[in-house]
């Protein structure tokens, strides 16, 4: 069976003046290789994202964690990227990844 791929993208605060452009590139790449994208942080409102069930925007890492607990199983691959300021490391820690 094919595994479902979920990508969690948090804001990457260290990118400087190209921040929006780089976040857009990250989103576009994730959109090509994953089944679902979970976004956290205010920059995603400046990014051209699909308004579908496969793209969800959350206010913080705790909301994403609660969602992930309800959908993760042995047939799911989880990819997480973001700066420590958006606490993406806590998602991995709490899920024991």
Predicted regions span which residues?
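ATP-dependent carboxylate-amine ligase
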Residues: 1-97
